[in-house]
């Protein structure tokens, strides 16, 4: 369920702080969100794919940890990011 390189480059370009920025928290959260959306669509079709479901839960947990880190360190970019990605604020 990996993202193709064109879609990944598009997400990186949209959320990067500077050119070539692939490791910032915002980019990581955006990439995880795209993978979560793809896995969710996959699991709607293949309901008994339990290994993918476990992978989805791991991705959601990782995104949750990154979002809590971003919320602590830079609340303004956190609030901007969750509005762009249509995520709920906890």
From Swiss-Prot:
Question: What do the Gene Ontology cellular component annotations say?
Answer: cytosolic small ribosomal subunit
Per its record, how is this protein called by name?
Small ribosomal subunit protein uS15
Oligomeric and partner information: Part of the 30S ribosomal subunit. Forms a bridge to the 50S subunit in the 70S ribosome, contacting the 23S rRNA.
SMART domains on file: Ribosomal_S15
Example GO biological process: translation
Q: Which PROSITE patterns match?
A: RIBOSOMAL_S15 (PS00362)
Question: Which GO terms of the molecular function aspect are on file?
Answer: rRNA binding; structural constituent of ribosome
Task performed by this protein: One of the primary rRNA binding proteins, it binds directly to 16S rRNA where it helps nucleate assembly of the platform of the 30S subunit by binding and bridging several RNA helices of the 16S rRNA.
Gene3D superfamilies cross-referenced by the UniProt entry: 6.10.250.3130, S15/NS1, RNA-binding
Q: Which UniProt keywords apply?
A: Ribonucleoprotein, Ribosomal protein, RNA-binding, rRNA-binding
Stored InterPro entries:
Ribosomal_uS15, Ribosomal_uS15_bac-type, uS15_NS1_RNA-bd_sf
NCBIfam families registered for this protein in UniProt: S15_bact
User: HAMAP family from the entry?
Assistant: Ribosomal_uS15_B
The UniProt family comment states: Belongs to the universal ribosomal protein uS15 family.
């Amino acid at each position: 369920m990996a993202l193709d390189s064109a879609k990944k480059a598009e997400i990186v370009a949209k959320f990067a702080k500077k050119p070539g920025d692939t490791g910032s928290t915002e980019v990581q959260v955006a990439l995880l969100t795209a993978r979560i959306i793809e896995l969710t669509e996959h699991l709607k079709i293949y309901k008994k794919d339990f290994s993918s479901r476990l992978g989805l839960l791991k991705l959601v947990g990782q995104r949750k940890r990154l979002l809590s880190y971003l919320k602590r360190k830079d609340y303004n970019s956190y609030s901007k990011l969750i509005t762009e990605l249509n995520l709920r604020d906890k």
